[in-house]
Every structure is written in structure tokens, then in C-alpha cells.
Amino acid sequence: MKFGILCNGNIFQQWQLETIRQLVTGGHSCDLLIVNANPLPQINFRDKLINYPYSKLIYRIWFRFMMRPEAKRPSNICDLHLVIPEIRCYTIKKGYSEYFNEADLKQINAHKLDFILRFGFGIIKGGILNAAKYGVWSYHHDDDRKYRGVPTGFWEIWYSDPVNAAILQRLTDKLDSGVILRKAYFKTINHSWQANLNNLLQSTTEWPLQVCRDIENGITGFLSVRNSPESAIFRLPDNLKMTRFLLKVAFNKLRFHFRDLFLTEKWNIGIIPIPIEKLINPGSYEIPEPQWLKINNKRSVYYADPFGYFVAGKINIVCIFLLY
């Protein structure tokens, strides 16, 4: 499949470059860079001082100088050694949205792309959304049903939510109501915002390649199911919230290291006597409690990563057995 990339130049974040690399090594062709040529607004130093959001100063300092996730490390697309034509585009601003002009859209359409990855520009609408066969694909690294807005991976820790989520969606003209191509949940790393964000970004790099494989295999039903989230839109935390957040993370880190030093994990294997499809697609029936394997010495043994199979009508289990 042929794809293009909406970007702000040759510099990408590490996880974005890894996404492109996986697509290319997976047999797909990067045929176009659509580069944001809009000039940055020029603001003089006096106006910056007057209009600076001092109520969010702690967040801005922390995010700029303390947040160093490996997944956001700047990386040059030239490192992939690809020859990619590019189009530099000036968009038309209407409210908070950006629209491409007809001349640029004509050039983009001429490349007959299968899809476009959005790694740049702002809120895009209009003809660009239909400039590729399967549209424009964009990431949202938060649970769209709970946390819309910014910052990524922050509010799950703030609200002690045990899981994060991320989605890859095909954009539509209605904000946050795209077509979900991929969605997954990840355990929240509540003792480190940096580690939590890093995990979210690096765990989703293969998604566009997976969607391409589905399309090539004729699995396309998900391409027309629209999403309609109704969650609140979150904003950057003010100084009070950020202070409380940092204290919470510090407490979580102390608790994490205490457990790591003085406590041990207990793993076991449970058997539920129902077909697996009932777990994948639960209905109105009641799922019974697992039948746990008996462990003779619970203090120094655990079982994990099981695989079950039947021999003469009896279930046998292959698993990891650890005695410590």
C-alpha cells in the first residue's frame, strides 16, 4: 500500500519514525511527505512576558526540562534512507481548523495514496480527509471515552485509573468522532509520568502496519464504524494541580520501590470451564469463578503463562514454574 505523511518537517519523534520504519519494512511504500509550510507566529519578548500563562508555569517547566521520554526523542527521517517526494503546503485557517487549498489537494490526489498518517499540522478538515483511499489516520494516546484533551498519560495517574488507552482513528470532519481502526488498553505506570507516556507511545507503533494487513486480507468491517465519545475535554494542569500531581507521583514511587524491595508477586493459574469465545464476547450469562491450581508451598512458588491441551479427555497444562 502507498501512504503519505502529514508532518512539520524532516524531524519526527522517535516513535513516529519507528511507525514509518515498520510500514516500510512491512512492504509498504512511503510516497509523499506533506510538509507544513505555515510560518510560526512572531511574538515579541514584551508580549510574551505579558501574555505568558503563569498559572501553568510549573507544568511548563516540568514538561520542558524534566520530561525526557525516549519515545519523543527527535529523529530525522533521513535516517531511514528513503527517497520521498514532498509537497510544502500552506493551509487556510478557519477558527481552530485548517483547510488545504485546491491546488495542493490536486497534487496530493495525483499520488493516489492509500492512506495518510498525521504526524503534523493541527485540526485538519475538508478535502484532505478524502485525499487518500482510506483517509487520514491519526493517533490519540488516551482513552477517548474518558480523557480527551491534554496532556497525554497525565490524567490517568491523577485519577488513579489503573489503565491507559490509545486509539488509531480515521479522521472525519467532526472532531473526536473518527472511525476507530485500533484501540488497546495498557497498565498505568503511576509512579512515573515519563515511563507511562513512553509506554503508551512505543506500544502503538505497529498499529498502522496491522491495519494494512487487515485491509489486504479483506478484513474491512471496522473501516465504517464511527466513534462518538462524550467525555469531557481536559486542559493543561494549573500550578496547584501540578504540585499535587508531583507529590502523588513521588508517593507512588516510594510505594513502588517499597513493594519491589520487601514484597513478592504471587502468580497462579485458574481454569474457567467455558469456551473462550464467551470471555472474548461476554453476553448476559454469568462467568463462573476460576478454579485455581493448588500450590503446596505458597510462600516460594508461582505458576504463570499457561497453555492448556486435552489428552484422553483430561486437561493438561504447560506453564512456567518458578521456585524461589
Where are these regions (language model features)?
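One-carbon transfer enzymes
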Residues: M1-Y324
